[in-house]
Amino acid sequence: MTQRSPYSSAIAEQRNQEWLRFVELLRQAYAEDLHLPLLQLMLTPDEREALGTRVRIIEELLRGEMSQRELKTELGAGIATITRGSNSLKSAPVELRHWLENVLLKNA
């Protein structure tokens, strides 16, 4: 069994606070129509591409028409990335899952 030191807990809390700070910054950027320039500043082209791929993974998992292996081939993503997306989707709050289905699949 691994014990977490108070130091690692403090680091985890600091990282969580930094994440929440970013989320608030992004919320403010949306309110002022500066979200695209902010995201372009904060994310590399590869990171933006990876986020787009993750949206596609979630979309296809919600659609349920392809196996994870087929998704791997179709999207060029690693099977571990697809499995993480699947596991995250399974543990997502029901409200979020319904919202994602409505937003991602409504025009499909």
From Swiss-Prot:
Coiled coil (residue ranges): none
Protein name per UniProt: Trp operon repressor
Lineage, uppermost ranks: Bacteria, Pseudomonadati, Pseudomonadota, Gammaproteobacteria, Enterobacterales
Keywords recorded for this protein, A-Z: Cytoplasm, DNA-binding, Repressor, Transcription, Transcription regulation
Binding region for DNA: 68-91
Principal location listed in the UniProt entry: cytoplasm
GO CC annotation: cytoplasm
HAMAP family the UniProt entry points to: Trp_repressor
Regions that span the bilayer: none
GO biological process: negative regulation of DNA-templated transcription
Annotated function: This protein is an aporepressor. When complexed with L-tryptophan it binds the operator region of the trp operon (5'-ACTAGT-'3') and prevents the initiation of transcription. The complex also regulates trp repressor biosynthesis by binding to its regulatory region.
Biological source species: Salmonella enteritidis PT4 (strain P125109)
Family: Belongs to the TrpR family.
Gene assigned in the entry: trpR
Keyword Cytoplasm: yes
Localization: Cytoplasm
GO molecular function terms attached to this record: DNA-binding transcription factor activity; sequence-specific DNA binding
Self-association and partners: Homodimer.
